[in-house]
Regions:
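ATP/NTP phosphate-donor binding region
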Residues: 1-100
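Active-site segments that bind and position negatively charged phosphate/pyrophosphate groups
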Residues: 200, 204-320
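Generic secondary-structure signature for well-ordered alpha-helical cores
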Residues: 92-95, 161-164, 170-177, 185-197, ...
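Solvent-exposed alpha-helices and their adjacent loops that cap or buttress functional pockets
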Residues: 8, 33-34, 94-96, 119-121, ...
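Short glycine/serine/threonine-rich phosphate/pyrophosphate-binding segments
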Residues: 108-115, 136-137, 254
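C-terminal charged capping/lid subdomain of soluble metabolic enzymes
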Residues: 3, 185-187, 287-372
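A glycine/threonine-rich phosphate-anchoring loop and its flanking beta-alpha core
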Residues: 115-208
Length: 372
C-alpha cells in the first residue's frame, strides 16, 4: 500500500509517496508532472548498479526518454567540481527550465542535484528518489540543497523544493546494516525533538525495523516525513521552528569536520551521538531530568549504535578544538552559537544560553579516557 504525505507550500506544494515497488511505478508517478517526456537522472556509483536499471525501465515503459550521469559515491561528491560536472551534464542534455531532473541516491546526491537544479536557468524542477533511510526521512524532504566547503558542511546552498518525492521502502533492503542504522539516527531524532509517543513506538519496534519489517519501515518513514513536513510548512527557510530539526547536529557537524567527512563517521551516526550529547548537556544544565539522556543512550545502544565520541575510531581533537569547530555551524547568528536543547523527550527548543564550560565537560566525558 502506498501512502502519501502532502507538503502544502502553495504553488510549490508537492507529495511524498511512501511504499513498496515505487521505482517500478516511476513512469506513472513522474509522468503527470512532465511538460515533455524527457528527464535527466543523476545517481552515484553505489546506487547505479542496484537501482538505475529499474528506474530507466519504468521510465521507458511510460515513453519517457532519459539520460544518466553516475558520480562517485561519498560525501566528497558534495563539492564544487561535481556540482560543475552535474550542471554541465544538464546543459549538454539541453535541460530547459520547465523540465524535470531526477536525484536517485542518498543525501549526497539529493543535496547536490537539488542545488544544481536550483541554480540551473535560475531554477528547474527536480524529483527526489531517495535510496537511503536517512534521505527518505530527512534530506529529500523540505528543500534544503547544497554542497560542502572546506570550512564546513552544507555552507553553500539554496532552498529549492522538489516537485515530488518517491520513497520506495524496498530499496532499503539493499542497505548495509551500518547505513540503515545511520539513517535510523535521523528517525530517532523526530521522536526526541517533538513526538515522545513516536520515540516509545521506536523503543518497541526498532528491532523489527532493523530486521527488515517493511510495514514498520513504512510507518517510520511516514511519521518522520509528516513531522518534517509540518515543521517545514511553518518555517520553510529556517527562521524559527525549523531549527529544531537540527537537534544533535551542532555536535554532529563538529564531529564530521573532525573526522574529515570520512567513513570514520557517517552523518546519521554523528546525529545519534549528537542527540545523546544534546540531552546530556540539557540534563547538566538542569533543563531536563537525567532519566532523559539515560533513556536516549539506552535505546541507541540497544540498536547497536554509537552514543559517544569514544565510539569513533581513531584520534579525535581536544574538547576545546571540537567546540571551536562548532563555531562554523549554520546556526551561528551574530557570532552567537545556538543549541537545540530539550526539556524532556519530545520537547526540544532553541537557545543560545548554553555554558561553554558545560559543553566542554560533556565533550570530555564523551571522549572517555581518550580526552586530551
Amino acid at each position: 500500500m502506498t501512502q502519501v504525505v502532502h507538503v502544502p507550500l502553495g504553488d510549490r506544494a508537492y507529495d511524498i509517496h511512501i511504499g513498496r515497488g515505487l521505482l517500478d511505478q516511476a513512469g506513472s508517478l513522474i509522468g503527470p508532472i512532465l511538460q515533455r517526456a524527457k528527464v535527466a537522472i543523476v545517481t552515484d556509483s553505489n546506487v547505479a548498479p542496484l537501482h538505475l536499471r529499474r528506474l530507466t525501465e519504468a521510465l521507458q515503459g511510460a515513453g519517457i526518454a532519459h539520460a544518466s550521469l553516475v558520480l562517485p559515491a561519498g560525501e566528497a561528491t558534495k563539492s564544487w567540481p561535481h556540482l560543475s560536472q552535474t550542471i554541465d551534464f544538464f546543459l549538454n542534455e539541453k535541460v530547459e527550465r520547465r523540465d524535470v531532473v531526477i536525484a536517485l541516491g542518498g543525501g549526497v546526491i539529493g543535496d547536490l542535484v537539488g542545488f544544481a537544479a536550483a541554480i540551473l536557468r535560475r531554477g528547474v524542477r527536480f524529483v527526489q528518489i531517495p535510496t537511503s533511510l536517512l534521505a527518505q526521512v530527512d534530506s529529500s524532504v523540505g528543500g534544503k540543497t547544497g554542497i560542502n566547503a572546506t570550512q564546513g558542511k552544507n555552507l553553500i546552498g539554496a532552498f529549492h523544493q522538489p516537485s515530488r518525492v518517491l520513497a520506495d521502502i524496498d530499496v532499503l533492503d539493499t542497505l548495509t546494516p551500518r547505513d540503515f542504522l545511520a539513517g535510523y539516527g535521523e528517525v530517532v531524532k523526530y521522536g526526541l525533538l517533538g513526538n515522545e509517543p513516536f520515540f516509545e513506538w521506536l523503543e518497541q519496534n526498532g528491532a523489527a525495523l532493523a530486521a527488515g519489517d517493511h510495514a514498520a519501515r513504512s510507518e517510520a518513514v511516514r511519521v518522520s516525513c509528516q513531522m518534517k513536513a509540518q515543521i517545514v510548512v511553518r518555517d520553510e527557510t529556517e527562521q524559527g521552528d525549523r531549527a529544531l530539526l537540527n537537534l544533535g547536529h551542532t555536535f554532529c557537524h563538529a564531529l564530521e569536520a573532525a573526522t574529515g567527512y570520512s567513513d570514520r563517521l557517517l552523518h546519521g551516526e554523528g546525529v545519534a551521538i549528537g542527540c545523546a550529547l544534546a540531552f546530556e548537556t540539557s540534563a547538566r544544565l538542569g533543563l531536563c531530568a537525567q532519566e532523559a539522556p539515560s533513556r536516549v543512550r539506552a535505546h541507541l545502544k540497544a540498536m547497536g549504535m554509537k552514543t559517544d565520541i569514544s565510539d569513533i575510531e581513531g584520534v579525535m581533537p581536544t574538547p576545546a578544538a571540537l567546540f571551536s569547530l562548532m563555531g562554523q555551524d549554520k546556526k551561528v547568528i551574530a557570532g552567537q552559537l545556538n543549541f537545540i536543547m530539550a526539556r524532556a523527550i519530545g520537547q526540544a527548543f532553541v537557545t543560545s544560553d548554553v555554558s561553554e564550560q558545560v559543553v566542554l565537560s560533556v565533550l570530555e566525558a564523551s571522549m572517555g579516557p581518550h580526552a586530551i
